[in-house]
């Protein structure tokens, strides 16, 4: 390698070549480790918490698993190769920095096994073949999982009352997740059966196709078709959800949607998303959650497929920025989950702060409070009382967490219930226990139901007319009964 003081015009002047290599490698590795950590945490959280055993969370776990493998290879492995390249290819990075406008034949790590016939070279080639296979399988499975997640949310919001609702089950989600890996493994076999077609490209500072003309291969066609299918499904589902939100918002604003339909739509959205959505930010949050992830996935896929044809027109730092943007796309999902879902944010906090371990430590200390100091003059009765209080506090802590989850998740229904109570107080301030509730306007004076019953019996000689009128005007109690039934179903579904 030439002198370390070698500079380039489009770099910052105080960066030498070695320092530039170190910064890029550290950035790749740091973002990769962050992505692996966040996505693995998401997988563990969904698998170990019973409250997340729903179809949408199952697909989210599959997406997180695929993203963690992609980040491990494209982030950590690629960053380490940037910092510590093979000794036989030390100058392979220089052409991408020195001559960005000249077409340079790509140099892959697979060449190490071709030029070196020793056992070490053969082992290195096998390692890179395994990395290439894992990357293709995980990336393909992740893209298809995105499409299935969008379909799941679209059914939950737009087609919740139809027979398509049966598709949003945990068993169906597990089967769909397994099918994504079957498709990914099949694509990886095609791409690595004879020799790896995707690997670390040092001339591109990224992972890309090894063939100079990848569009001529069958593997490129299959991979492109799978990605186009996944992106198309994402965009169709996102568009349907946004149109549904816009339609319902317009009807509510024009007072063309009755109360039952509005409540039913709110319940569908809460059951579908299982998250806290403030009424004022309802449309904005759903728009962000369904629209912008599709944009990020589309940009990421476009960058991956266009890079083999555009890298000769880009300089080194531009290729580095593109690769970092690509890595950020596979890292941002846990942050989106934590922002939109209070329950997931609380669980993330418990995992990151080691709440379970700290609880066990406090429990052990409280069960043996004086062992460290050698004091044994505490009676068994007081010790048992302390252990009992610890168990009660632990149960109350879990109850508070579960209660917070139910209370937050049913925030909208609580508002409806408050309006129901206000309506009942307005039309029946005497707390009559009968079901003869009657909707009254603010203009007409209030008249109790028992007075109307007496007048009706006195004038018409019977209560048959009153009974039919009372039966026809029991809308309020029906609404309250439906609300309570919905709460019970939601609590059972959340296993609380």
UniProtKB/Swiss-Prot annotation:
Stretches assigned to the Extracellular side: 1-19, 80-128, 191-216, 307-318
InterPro entries for the chain: GPCR_Rhodpsn
Primary location class: membrane
Cytoplasmic side: 41-58, 150-169, 238-285, 340-496
Key words of the record: Cell membrane, G-protein coupled receptor, Glycoprotein, Membrane, Receptor, Transducer, Transmembrane, Transmembrane helix
Positions annotated as glycosylated: 111
Protein's cellular compartments: Cell membrane
Any one Gene Ontology molecular-function term assigned to this protein's record: G protein-coupled receptor activity
Region (Disordered): 451-470
Domain of life (superkingdom): Eukaryota
Membrane-spanning residues: 20-40, 59-79, 129-149, 170-190, 217-237, 286-306, 319-339
GO biological process: G protein-coupled receptor signaling pathway
Residues making up the signal peptide according to the UniProt record: none
GO (cellular component) term, any one: plasma membrane
Bilayer topology: Multi-pass membrane protein
CDD domains: 7tm_classA_rhodopsin-like
Family: Belongs to the G-protein coupled receptor 1 family.
Designated name of the protein: Probable G-protein coupled receptor K01A12.3
Origin organism lineage: Eukaryota, Metazoa, Ecdysozoa, Nematoda, Chromadorea
């Amino acid at each position: 390698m030439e002198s370390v003081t070698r500079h380039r015009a489009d770099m910052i002047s105080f960066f030498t070549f070695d320092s530039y290599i170190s910064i890029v490698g550290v950035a790749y590795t740091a973002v990769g480790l962050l992505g692996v950590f966040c996505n693995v945490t998401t997988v563990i959280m969904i698998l170990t918490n019973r409250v997340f055993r729903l179809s949408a969370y199952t697909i989210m776990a599959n997406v997180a698993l695929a993203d963690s493998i992609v980040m491990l290879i494209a982030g950590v492995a690629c960053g380490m190769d940037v910092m510590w390249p093979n000794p036989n290819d030390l100058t392979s990075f220089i052409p991408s920095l020195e001559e960005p406008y000249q077409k340079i034949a790509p140099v892959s790590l697979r060449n190490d096994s071709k030029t070196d016939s020793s056992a070490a070279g053969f082992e290195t080639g096998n390692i890179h073949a395994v990395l290439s296979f894992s990357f293709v399988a995980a990336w393909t499975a992740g893209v298809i999982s995105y499409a299935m997640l969008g379909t799941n949310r679209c059914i939950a919001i737009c087609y919740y009352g139809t027979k398509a609702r049966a598709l949003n089950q945990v068993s169906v989600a597990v089967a769909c997740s397994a099918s994504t890996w079957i498709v990914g493994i099949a694509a990886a076999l095609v791409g690595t059966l004879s020799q790896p077609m995707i690997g670390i490209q040092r001339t591109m500072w990224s992972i890309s196709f090894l063939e100079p003309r990848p569009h001529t291969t069958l593997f490129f066609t299959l991979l492109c078709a799978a990605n186009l299918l996944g992106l198309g499904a994402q965009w169709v589902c996102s568009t349907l959800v946004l149109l549904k939100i816009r339609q319902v918002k317009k009807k509510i604003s024009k007072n063309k949607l009755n109360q039952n339909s509005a409540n039913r739509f709110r319940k569908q959205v809460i059951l579908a998303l299982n998250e806290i959505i403030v009424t004022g930010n309802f449309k904005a949050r759903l728009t962000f959650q369904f629209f912008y992830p599709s944009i990020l996935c589309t940009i990421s896929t476009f960058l991956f497929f266009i890079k083999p044809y555009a890298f000769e027109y880009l300089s080194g730092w531009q290729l580095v920025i593109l690769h970092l943007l690509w890595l950020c796309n596979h890292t941002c999902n846990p942050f989106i989950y934590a922002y939109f879902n209070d329950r997931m944010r609380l669980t993330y906090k418990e995992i990151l702060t080691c709440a379970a371990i700290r609880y066990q430590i406090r429990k052990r200390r409280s069960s043996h409070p004086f062992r460290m100091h050698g004091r044994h003059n505490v009676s068994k009765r007081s010790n048992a009382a302390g252990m009992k209080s610890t168990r009660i506090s632990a149960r109350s802590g879990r109850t508070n967490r579960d209660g917070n989850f139910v209370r937050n998740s049913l925030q909208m229904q609580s508002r409806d219930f408050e309006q129901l109570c206000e309506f009942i107080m307005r039309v029946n301030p005497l707390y009559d226990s009968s079901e003869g509730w009657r909707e009254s306007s603010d203009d007409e004076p209030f008249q109790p139901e028992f007075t109307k019953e007496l007048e009706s019996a006195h004038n018409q000689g019977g209560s048959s007319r009153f009974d039919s009128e009372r039966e026809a005007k029991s809308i309020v109690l029906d609404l309250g009964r439906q609300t309570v039934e919905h709460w019970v179903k939601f609590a059972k579904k959340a296993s609380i």
